[in-house]
A protein has these predicted regions:
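N-terminal glycine-/charge-rich "phosphate-binding" loop or analogous flexible N-terminal tail
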Residues: 1-56, 319, 335-336, 340-352
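Rossmann-like dinucleotide/phosphate-binding beta-alpha-beta segment
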Residues: 3-4, 34, 147-238, 346-352
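Internal hydrophobic alpha-helix adjacent to the cofactor/substrate pocket in enzyme cavities
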Residues: 306-325
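Adenosine-phosphate binding glycine-rich loop
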Residues: 287-309
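Short beta->alpha connector loops at strand-helix junctions that form conserved
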Residues: 84-85, 101-112, 186, 204-205, ...
Length: 352
């Protein structure tokens, strides 16, 4: 590789054969290869990772050590951090902005997949699939129908959406095809935008009190942390089900366990948890009225290749002096010398 190429750091928890880099990151390098090379940083501690990326021109991440303010302050040449997911909670966005570093994500690669998964969780909870599966396996063939005879049909039920970004919009379309009424709360999206999609904009209190099913789609940050805790659950229907395919810490897990145990709400469908992987004794894994999947909502044959290509394209754009397609910290623009070449609005963020 040419020595004048930009250097992009990516975390590797073990020493790897440098000759395999071109193969291992072939999809990212489709866009990056003319301008940059990928350098694997074998680090076992945050300090080792910080030392390894100190002189890099960019970083690609989606897991591993958090790129916090302390690490960002040590970066001498970094101009871009490419995140290979929708959520960007592994990066201190404010610190990156102060340092003049562009942060990109991939907000529109696996929208449909996550919306499918959210709807699957909703349907599974609505039809009590965990219980139905157990009854079938245990030979209780005639016990399921009497139980479901007390369950209202999905048509006419209300789905509430917490945040109204790309995934929420796709979930709304799916829910409406089942005859559900859809409401949404998002203080960062205009009511006209929400209502234009046939979705009713509501306040947070109305979202809680009216939803039969409540699907969580917000990014995780200081503002949204533990948005659903004891107070929120107390305002929900005792027949309500909460679904989370966004980020675990949006829900106060301890409060959720109590709410489910005390029948404050009826159930939950969770693809994400506060601690991942969870401990084996986490009560949520063993509750009859809870469906849990291991953070796989976006997983399909298409997801990883397209995500990797998109990260490579975003980082390559910045290294070429151009504004990326998806910047989660657009207020960094005055601090960088980038050509804003495309008509994307400047208010694009991690949930759009």
């Amino acid at each position: 590789m040419s020595s004048n190429k930009k250097k992009i750091g990516i975390q590797l928890p073990r020493q790897a054969n440098p000759e395999e880099v071109a193969i291992r990151y072939s999809l990212e390098l489709e866009a990056l290869d003319p301008v940059a090379e990928i350098i694997e940083v074998a680090a076992q501690t945050p300090e080792e990772f910080a030392a390894g990326v100190k002189h890099m021109d960019g970083i690609i991440t989606s897991w591993g050590f958090r790129i916090d303010a302390a690490l960002i302050e040590q970066l001498e040449n970094c101009v871009v951090i490419g995140v290979g997911s929708v959520g960007v909670d592994m990066v201190d966005i404010e610190a990156a902005t102060r340092a003049g570093i562009v942060v990109t994500n991939v907000p529109d690669v696996f929208i449909e997949e996550v919306a499918d998964h959210a709807m699957m969780m909703l349907l599974g909870c609505a039809r009590q699939m965990k219980t139905m599966n157990r009854m079938a396996a245990e030979g209780q063939w005639w016990s399921g129908r009497p139980l479901l005879n007390h369950t209202p049909r999905l048509m006419g039920q209300t789905l509430g959406l917490f945040a109204y970004g790309n995934v929420a919009r796709c979930t709304a379309r799916r829910a409406k095809s089942f005859g559900m009424h859809v409401i949404a709360f998002d203080p960062y999206v205009s009511e006209l935008t929400i209502s234009d999609d046939g979705v009713e904009p509501v306040s947070m209190d109305k979202l809680l009190s009216r939803s039969d099913y409540l699907s969580v789609h917000a990014p995780h940050n200081e503002e949204t942390h533990h948005s659903f805790s004891t107070d929120a659950f107390s305002k929900m229907k005792d027949t309500a089900v909460i679904v989370n395919t966004a980020r675990g810490p949006l829900i106060d897990e301890a409060a959720l366990i109590v709410a489910l145990h005390d029948k404050v709400i009826a159930g939950a469908g969770l693809d994400v948890l506060e601690q991942e992987p969870p401990s084996a004794d986490n009560p949520l894994l063993h509750m009859e009225n809870v469906l849990v999947s291991p953070h796989v909502a976006s997983a399909t044959t298409r997801m990883r290749p397209e995500t990797r290509r998109r990260v490579g394209r975003e980082v390559a754009l910045v290294l070429r002096g151009r504004w990326p397609m998806s910047c989660v910290n657009p207020t960094v623009l005055p601090k960088v010398q980038l050509e804003r070449w495309q008509p994307y609005p400047m208010n694009r963020g991690p949930n759009r």
